[in-house]
UniProtKB/Swiss-Prot annotation:
Pfam families: RNase_HII. It comes from Cronobacter sakazakii (strain ATCC BAA-894) (Enterobacter sakazakii). This is Ribonuclease HII. Manganese or magnesium. Binds 1 divalent metal ion per monomer in the absence of substrate. May bind a second metal ion after substrate binding. Residues 10-198 form the RNase H type-2 domain.
Amino acid sequence: MMEFIYPHTHLVAGVDEVGRGPLVGAVVTAAVILDPLKPIVGLADSKKLSEKRRLALFDEIKEKAIAWSLGRAEPHEIDELNILHATMLAMQRAVAGLAVTPEYVLVDGNRCPALPMPSMAVVKGDSRVAEISAASILAKVTRDAEMAELDLTFPQYGFAQHKGYPTAFHLERLAEHGATAHHRRSFAPVRRALGIAS
């Protein structure tokens, strides 16, 4: 893995996404500029934290960050653009939504969206860069809450449990009940459930 050198600048935003793999719902992104004078203990990749810890950190990040913002790309945008381009769009929206303009942006993964300021992709950034960890927590808690809400409308699919990922249970329910308006039509399992040849 390439050595990561933190940029020598004051306002650094971290950006991450949640929800590229699910068959349903939006891809959700977050951008966060942390305040070095208000450290947050325990930031880590959101996937490695318990739900209780994520929720506590979610509130602390929003309270202590210099700026934070959420972005998203809806299922119809994912279907029109493809998941990669929709994710880049959602990241651009998160950065554009920051109340304070960052001087530099660090993005989790190996690809950066086109941004008006310098940026760098950081592989495994969600466990290496505090700002990206914070962004991953905001994005995951937000998307998980949306899946829990969708579960209330469509309890037969089990969205609260699998968060829309293609688990055996989800695929079984998709075959049995068909797709909701929130499913991503361009994803192969959804196309199969709708009887659309891929």
